[in-house]
Amino acid sequence: MIDYLSYTYSPREYGYTWLKGFCMGAVLLYLFYDNVLIGIIGGVFAGILYAVSHKKYLISMRKWELNMEFKEGIAGISTALRAGYSIENAFTEAEKDLRILYNGQSYIEKEFAYIEKQLALNRTVEELLHELAIRSGIEDIESFAGVFITAKRTGGDMVAIIQSTVKNINEKLEVKREIQTMVTAKKLEGKIMNLIPPLMIAYLRISSPGFLDPLYHNLTGMLIMSAMLGIYVLAYQIGKQILDMEV
């Protein structure tokens, strides 16, 4: 099954991601140094760094999708339990609902189908939920698995406990969704602001040829441009870390 804490590029996907990073890095370095060789060499490393950074983004997005889908999954389990199904059959019923809802295009449907198959091999629900919690690294799934395992061992009112847990997780995810919506708008603003410095340099080079020549092809100019590039990259990283903070 999927390890949600890691991501493996396909050769084609990696090539496309690397090329995207290479182009951005090469253009940026050429604008700052007016040197094709520096642009190409720097672009190669920029492509590698971008692929690593983008992998973290893909992992984060996949976990977010699973988290939102999990909300629907446990809601289905709760409904099935209220209808009188056993916990094992509740997963089967929830998987059927998920199949209709997502048409086979969701992570949680595959996870519930896997749980259903493993239950047929006499594995326990507790064991399978614990396994999913470890593979996903998602707090809500870990919380649900912990509550479920405790309730099963202590013989508590499973339906009431799961309903309460589902309600808490739903409320928490709604808050996360609202925050995510606000952060998305700020991320767009950040991307636009990140484009301003290189676009200004490009504009000056096109509209006023020779205006930036004192900053190119000499040691003093290279040091100044390197300092400006360092400040630009540092500001970009600080902004990215602030907006990428876990909610």
Predicted ranges, named:
Residues 1-75, 173-181, 185-247:
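Hydrophobic alpha-helical signal-anchor/transmembrane segments
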Residues 42-134, 139-151, 157-159, 163:
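Juxtamembrane/interface alpha-helical elements of multi-pass membrane proteins
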Residues 32, 81, 119-120, 152, ...:
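Hydrophobic residues in alpha-helical segments
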Residues 84, 122, 155-156, 221, ...:
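Glycine-centered flexibility sites
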Residues 137-194:
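Membrane-associated alpha-helical segments
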